[in-house]
Design a protein with these regions (language model features):
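Conserved ABC ATPase "signature" region
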Residues: 135-153
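Conserved ABC transporter NBD signature motif
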Residues: 85-98
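Catalytic Walker B motif of ABC-type/P-loop ATPase nucleotide-binding domains
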Residues: 182-185
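Short loop immediately C-terminal to the Walker-B catalytic DE motif
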Residues: 188-189
Length: 241
């Protein structure tokens, strides 16, 4: 997949460099990035980015390692403060309506808990001092497990699952918080072809049901079959040099 292919995918969408107001009027923006710079210490990974994420997008973020893709997701999720510029939440979107699935870590893979406990942990901090989860939380957890095809695994030990099953459980956990926007960071990394296809179909189904999806991926060709827009960080990373 080259830059020309990506440009064709975005032909009718707003440019990363100069968003066009006439095009944005046809869309409802969920968030707007204006002159956004993100990074760590003295190193800027995202520079002066102007970009809108619109309601209903399936936005695929591509780019080489170190180009700022994960940094951008962390900024949207509220886990990284901009060095300059702003990330504006629009159309009534709040942080607690954003679900975030980071790249899986060794600790996550070996966590000794049941699938149901893992998914319910998305609500920690939302049930105040009660020693149990509310019925609404349990109902939402079961709904998200059904959407990710993990409901039959509810009582299973998480660390005994296959890689694909674990990732679908973590997707269910992220989905519990994702009322309107779902952020996915390399959700199929390390999965076998069958598990990868299953994950993509689940994500596409969530998008078809109205979820706005922003996904970082290296699997560009496959992801673009479903993506409605593409943000190429190989291009953005050059900006400002």
């Amino acid at each position: 997949m080259n830059s020309e292919d990506i440009q064709k995918k975005n032909l009718s969408q707003n440019s990363q460099r100069e968003p066009q107001a006439t095009e944005l009027t046809a869309h409802t923006s969920l968030l707007k990035c204006r002159q956004l710079t993100l990074g760590y210490g003295s190193k800027d990974l995202v520079r002066d980015l102007d970009y809108d994420v619109n309601a209903g997008d399936y936005l695929c973020i591509v780019g080489r390692n170190g180009s700022g893709k994960t940094t951008f997701l962390r900024g949207i999720a509220g886990l990284l403060k901009p060095k300059s510029g702003v990330i504006e939440l629009c159309d009534g979107l709040s942080r607690n309506q954003i679900g975030y699935l980071p790249q899986m870590t060794i600790v996550q893979k070996d966590f000794p808990a049941s699938v149901e406990e893992i998914v319910l942990s998305a609500f920690q901090g939302k049930h105040r001092l009660l020693p149990f989860y509310r019925k609404a939380h349990r109902d939402r957890a079961m709904e998200c497990m059904a959407l990710t095809r993990t409901e039959s695994l509810a009582k299973s030990c998480f660390r005994e699952l296959s890689g694909g099953q674990k990732q679908r459980v973590l997707l269910a956990r992220a989905l519990c918080a994702a009322e309107r926007l779902l952020l996915l960071d390399e959700p199929v990394t390390g999965l076998d072809p069958e598990s990868t296809e299953t994950m993509y179909r689940i994500i596409e189904n969530l998008h078809q049901q109205g979820m706005t999806v922003v996904m970082v991926t290296h699997d560009v060709d496959t992801a673009l079959d479903d993506a409605t827009r593409v943000l190429d960080f190989n291009t953005i990373s050059v900006k400002g040099k």
